[in-house]
Amino acid sequence: MIRFNNDYNHAAHESIYEAMKADQANNYPGYGADEWCTKAAEEIKKLIGREDPAIYFFPGATQANFVVCAAALNSIQSVVCPKTGHINCHEAGSIENTGHKIIELPSTEGKIMAQQVRECASSYFEHGEAEYLTEPKLVYISFPTEYGTIYSLKELQELHRVCKEYGMYLFVDGARMGYGLGASVNDVTLKDLAELTDVFYIGGTKCGAMFGEAVILVNEELKRHFKTYMKQNGAVLAKGWLLGLQFYTLLKDGTYFSITKKADEQAIRIKEAFHKKEILEYMGSYTNQQFVILSKEQEEKLSQKYIFELDGVLPDGRSVVRFCTSWSTTDEEVNELVQDILAL
């Protein structure tokens, strides 16, 4: 069986194995106080064009999401996010478990717009009895979204302005950051994210690392006691240098960006094959996740050779499925899938 079900079904890019092997004889202090984490943070600061952000390395993305929210909010504040947001649908109530309410907003192709956030914030601040409500304080979005779509620079700028107007934090989940940056339609850079957000992260687990996410704290207000929140929530890895080594290895020569861009290009080949067969897209994605609508017969035929993800069933019985390429997907695997799509 050929896997197109996710972007974390191989361990790590070969350059990471080579770096780990070369470093095997060395030893380091624990908990991120090592030279690899320092070097990785320096690489990230070069990429974002700023020296002032604080950078912390997490083992996983769910940990990054709930620690950021826990550290940013007090007990009467809440998170605003798309209805389809990862923290709302795929994290087992981790945000709610920190004691914070999620205010979900209707999403269009996985995104929420500045006007929606404005309406949410203004309804709170203009409410006659706001003391009986939670204050919407942090806006959570992801880049790319759960459906592989991406925010334009203009959309991010508008969200940034609204957040500043109402004193809200803008938090960008970047678990698939490489695939978003590598999309052919993308006009957002890491430097833009460092200017427009209060906190964001560069994902490693889904983008070539064995594990790990690099959280970039831009807003000074979020830095105080942040590592204490990490430790309190089990997010500080004792062997922290393994995180730093991986990020330094992937970022120092652009490997992170080249391998994720290739996965996007492979996904577009799959997208085009479905187009040729007049099979409808569910969302207009230009990243490594492609969502299409298949008949039961088409789904059964492809599932004989490929593993892909069922996202939902439409009222007429057709299936919404996801085909996901990754940094480890081979051209041969894509060639086979394209041929079988065209043979449907």
In which residue ranges do the predicted regions lie?
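Hydrophobic beta-strand scaffold residues
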Residues: 102-103, 170-172, 281-282, 309
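Catalytic PLP-binding core of fold-type I/II PLP enzymes
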Residues: 151-183
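PLP-dependent aminotransferase-class I/II
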Residues: 99-144, 151-158
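Conserved C-terminal alpha-helix-loop-beta "cap" of PLP-dependent enzymes
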Residues: 75-76, 268, 273-342
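Conserved PLP-anchoring active-site segment centered on the Schiff-base-forming lysine
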Residues: 71-89, 118
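Active-site C-terminal subdomain of aminotransferase-like
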Residues: 108-109, 135, 142, 150, ...
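Conserved N-terminal alpha-helix of the aminotransferase class I/II PLP-enzyme fold
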Residues: 14-61, 83-88, 94
